[in-house]
Every structure is written in structure tokens, then in C-alpha cells.
Amino acid sequence: PPGSTYKMVTTIAAIDSGTISRWTEIEDEGVYTRFEDAGYMPRCMLYTTTGATHGLINVMKALAVSCNYYFYEAGYRTGITAIDNVAKALGLGEPTGIELPEATGRRANPETKKELYDEGHDGWYDADTVAASIGQSENRFTPLQLCSYTAALANRGVRYTATLLKRVLSSDYQKLIRENQPVVASTLDISDEAYAAYSEGMREAVTSGTAYSAFVGYDVAVCAKTGTAQHGSGGSDNASFVLYAPADDPEIAIAVYVEKGAQGGTLGTIARDILTAYFSEAGSTDTVPAENTLN
């Protein structure tokens, strides 16, 4: 599962369905008791680890500190249809279009649940929506899909087909033989308010939230989101980390996923090293090193 890197999906769906505004506050009570009678009481990670809560917060702060409780309630109010529509438009559970065989993953929704379980299973519950809203349930995506999704967030809903090939030059670099042009794979009309909510929340994750330690004193403004996902197979949780940068004029999107990597915040240093390489002189793509050529 993608874990909390999925929360931007829920943010967009909740705001653009009119369910919340970016200023709507929800009280984090630690334990989500809406489904207590059914024995399902998920917890916010902060409460699980420290016994504390995030208190009364809006969606931007909830993204920055990765408050599960906020997104349990926002997802419940929004419903799975709106959430799933946003996830699909942003490329999650969809082919990226890369020139290699790829897994398409799957999105948590009633159709997926019906396919995965036998006919005796009695359908989709609101509790399923709550789990899906924080990137759990049946959500399963490839790292490339997470990267494509993050790039679409940076592009305010425009998702491009993924490709490995930028251009083909002659052996002496003097002739352009072929150059790939960007191809739009899908678009999502994201409102100004929803864009402001997730971009500011991801920025705050870096300046004061769960991604802070990896980017202290970093020269480039970064928007990022950490993710920690339970997988049910024992051992540490899976960890994910996504970012785009620069925050105000994005050039690059990065996704890092480590199975049993414990917490997404620990992957920030990996993403930072990639970002540093990209923005360094050595990371320039204007020229092609000889070892990357075919004669």
C-alpha cells in the first residue's frame, strides 16, 4: 500500500466535492470510534506511539503531520466514489505508458473488493472507505505510478505518459534523430483551493512536519509527503516518500518505496540525494555521457 502518500487524493476529493474547505478543522481524538460497535477503531499514529493527539487541525496541517484521524473523517464524509475518481485521474492503478511491461496495481473500491473476495462477501463498507482514505485497504501501486501521480500533483492535475527515452542523437551528437514529445495521459480539473491545500500541506511537511529532518537547510524549496503502510506479512511497515521541486515551479518528481522500511520519513535522505544530484552540474541532461550512448 502507498500509505499516507495517498492523502493528497483524499484532500482533493474532499475539497472539490464540497465536503470540506481547506480551513475545515477536525478534532483528532486519537482513536476513531465511529465504527466502535463493529469493533473497528483505527488510531492516529501519534496516539499509538505517544498517547498524544494533534488536536483541532485543518487539512494542510493534517498533511504536514500526517494525521490519520483527520483523513479517516474526511474520507468518511466524502465517500469512496469521489476518492476513487480522483485516484484514477491521477494515474493510480492505471498504466503509466512506459515502454516496458508493467503492473497496473489496483485501487481500493467496491469493484476491486468484489474481484478479490468470494461471492459470499457482503460488499463495501464505510469502514473500507476510511481505511482507503489513508492509503491502506486494497490500494496497491507501483513506485512508478507513485512518481507519475506526484508529477501530476505538481502539474495541477495534468498527467503525462511515462517514458525512458528523451531523445536519440547521432553518434557524433550533431544530428537529432528522434525526440519524444510529452503526451498527456489524463487530466483532472483541480480547484485553486484544493491545489493550495495539498501544495501548502506538502510544503509544510518539509518546513515543520514529517519530512523536516531530511531537508533542514536545503537550498531548494521542496513539497513532500511521507508514507508508512501496514502490509500484514510481519516485520516492519513499508515506507514511502514522494516529492516534487522546486515547490513554486516544479521540474522533478521523485518517489521512493522501501518494503519494510519502517517509516516514510527515513527515506527522505534518499530522495534528497537524488534531488541534489539532479540540481547539480553533473546532473545536467543537456549532454549525454559516452557510457549512455549506443553506436
Placement of each model-derived feature along the sequence:
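Beta-lactam-recognizing serine transpeptidase/beta-lactamase-like catalytic domain environment
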Residues: 1-4, 9-256, 294-295
